[in-house]
Structure formats: structure tokens, C-alpha cells
């Protein structure tokens, strides 16, 4: 062997042995009990909470000094329902040696097994995870300043040095106020840092949803402590998998002190489903608010939910998010294919001017704008056009048991509203929506999937519908103008079946969802008895609970016609039928408005 190489190996082994002996010698002076007390006091200074260790504590010397403790708990805030915010079956801390010799604790790695976290908010929206230590009283400000400063320096050094966090078999219980707790399982979480990068591996299970996040980012630790203090630039290269479907997240984030962050992010996927994301967003939206806020209490009796939308999750930033998803699953709907858009963020506004997707063989394009989303009444505007698809295509892909054939469909919308919930948005809405459906055959299962309102309308139009499993539709058109949440219908909703011409008139108040709709079905032959049974029916109640009532005006008109018919030998009845044929023989054509007046991509 080369002499120089031998000397190098001997020197290396000697250094390694010296370091090992030094570590053993230093560790021999470390008492686990005293170290436990030091850890508890450090956590107390950093968080204001009590750290208790009731199980055995062991000390390992190689490859680094580590303390392993069992049956560990961190106390909760005074108002929380559970006495402990965190409990651990086992926790392991890798501790830096030289700071320890000076009487301070710097942790480089935390490993946790069997973590149970009890997270909770109170009535004012404050979370128990706020670990800001209490401010000491009884001393002058001049005296407090240096003491607190020294304490903060010690506290910061304890946690800034953490490079790795490993969590196995964790359970997180989140309780919003007095509501039932949501249980989230965390089989694995690993955060590591090296060479200015952070590696992430996360597995989460919530109800029937599973989430996996893995990849690399710029240093999360550096970004956390440098945010708004010095320039931060982070690269993103992550894969988010929800229920087996993966979304690639790539891009960068740039943050300069006292300036809104900027970003350029790309989201790409062959197939992705929004249902799990919506469920996790609902939990994150409740758990994410650290500052006190006025609770938003849903009413629970509206068709359009009064549950607050997660506007608070939207970032105040300047940037771009490009989305390209080959197949996007939508809860309760047929999947969208070739879904593409570019989201433009500018402070508290978001615009998507190029949203496009396919449904079945049809296509859709839309423009969406959200303005002032950080305020009490964000403004939302949506307009778009969907065409060249059919009910048959949608039903075949969404529910194979509900059969339909044909039904070429065309939809255009141009709506604006404001508020924090769907109910507020529609209750203050202005604009118009138009739907046109061509010739097709609909079975009863398809109609029943339309909900209580649709079923009530069909039953009122045709009381014999339940005896037949199919409705032959010639056409249907609904032109619905909205003025401050009020929809007024006057021959702007019409339909034709193989037997009937149908028009609707009346109003829908979206603010309270009250219905006041008269149904006017006419036999195509015009050979009626003069008693229009459909004209006697009015849809009342609400969108959530529609009811078929009596149209008193229709009763009077029919009674007058019948009475005059007896007096005139049926002449008045024939005249009324002729008038009906002349004015309502083309209800779809009468209701249909120009598509370009509703939506134009150039507007």
C-alpha cells in the first residue's frame, strides 16, 4: 500500500477515535434526568406550555447524541376541552453536542411515534396551537427587554437548528368550536433539509380520502425564518396524489422583504379528482385561521349552501398558476377533459380569462373573476358557453343506471354576485343564464336525479309521469334573467314533449329561495275540455322544499271559461283553445334569446 495512503488512513482513524472518545467523555457528564428538566424548561420558555415525560428516558451516544423518551405530553391551553394538546408514545431528539456543553439545547432532528394531536378553536376563532409564550408582568419595560431578548435568542437556537422531522402513526383530531371533532390519520410525515433544499414525504388519510405529497422544495426552514426579513427564492418540484391520482406541481416562489410574493407555478396531471381536495380544503379552511374571526353560522335550510367559501385560503400575491389536466373529476358530475386555464393573481384579485374544457363530445369556455377576496363581500363574476354535448353523453359517463338518448345541449351564462357563501352570491346576483336542450328521450331515473324541484315540476306538468318510465322531449329552453337575486319568468321557460307544449311563468327569489311559479301545459291537438288542469297548479315553497299548490287565478279563469261555454254552446271554449294554439304553439322558440347577447368571448 502507498505510504502516503497508509498515513492518511491512520490519521483518519485516530481522529475518528478521538472524536468518539470525546463524545463519550462529554456524554458521561450528561444526566438523563437533568437533561429532561433542561428540555422541559426550554419548551416552557419557547411555548408557555408544560412538557411532561412519565415514561423511561434513554440516552444514545452514536452516531450522535440522542435522547429517547416515552409517554410524553405537551399541555393544552386553558380553554381547551382536552388537558393535553400533544401526546407521544415515543419521541426521539438528536441534540447538538457543543451547545449542550454550554447548557443550551439545539435540536437537529425530531422523531415521533404514536403522536396524538388535539387541535381546537374557541368561539372567537382562536386556535390552541398558538404557542406564543405568555408575557411576564411586574417588571419594568427596561428590565424586561434584555431578559426577553436573551430568552428569544435561546428559544430560536433551539428550533432553528432542526433539520429533520420524522412522524409515524399520528392521529390529528380537529374540533371547530363545539362541533364534532374531525379525525385525520397521518401514517407518515418526513421533512428533511440539506444543501438549501427540503425533502417532503407525507401520507394523510381523512374519511374515505387518501393524500400523498412527495418531492423537494427550497429550504422550508430558511424560508420560514427569512420571510419578510431577507429575500427568499424557492423552487417547487412536488407530486400530490389524491386517491391514487397524481398532480405534478412545479415552479418557483420569490419573496422580497415588505413586498407581496410572486410565483410562477404549473399544475399538470393525466387524471385528477377534485372531491378529495374539496374535503381537505374544508378542514384546512377551518384550521388555517390563526387570527380571531367572527364565526360564520350556516343556516342549513338553503338549496345554495350558506357555508362560508374558503376565500381565506387564497394568497395575497402576484403570480401565475397554469393548469393542464387531461381528465378532471368533478363531484357529482361527468369529468371534464382537456381542462386548461391560467390563473392570474394580482394582490386580492384572481382572473381566469382562458378557461376551457370538454364534456363528452362537447366543449366549454369560460371567464372567471374574483375581486377583493380578502374583504367581507368578495365579488365574483362568471361567464361562459358550453355547446355540442348531449344529455346522453353526460348521463353515460356520470351514471350508467340513468339512461337518456339525444338531448343536444347548449348553455350560456353571464353572472355577477358578491358574498362569502354560495347563498349570498346568488342572493345578490345579476345577469342571465340560458339552457337549451334538443330532442331526446329521458327515463324516470334521470328526471329523479334533478332533485325535488325538478321532480315537482315534472309531476305537476304530467301527473301520469310515474306510470311511464320514459319522457319524449322535443325541446326545452330556459332563459333566466337575474336582477339582484330575483328571477322573473314570463314565457321565458318553455318545453315541448310528444304530447304537450309547456310554459312557465312567475318568479324565483334567490335571496330567500321562495318559489312562485305557474305551470301552463297545453295539449298539442288543442282539443281540450276547456279545463286546463295544468293551469290549476302552482309551484310554491322553496328550492329546498318545493310544494305544488293551487293556482287560484287559474281556477277562476277556467271556471269562467266553462260557464261561458255552457251559455254559448262551446264557442268560448273553442276560441280559448284557438288562442292557446296561436300564442303557445312554439314555447321553445318564444323563450330562446340570442346566444351572443349572453356570452361573447370578446366581451
Which positions does each model-derived feature cover?
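Generic short beta-strand segments
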Residues: 70-75, 115, 168-173, 324-328, ...
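Elongated, acidic membrane-bridging lipid-handling scaffolds
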Residues: 19, 136-233, 300-345, 473, ...
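Amphipathic hydrophobic-ligand
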Residues: 49-52, 78-95, 107, 178-193, ...
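N-terminal amphipathic/hydrophobic interface segments
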Residues: 6-9, 15-77
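Extended terminal
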Residues: 2-12, 24, 228-241, 245-247, ...
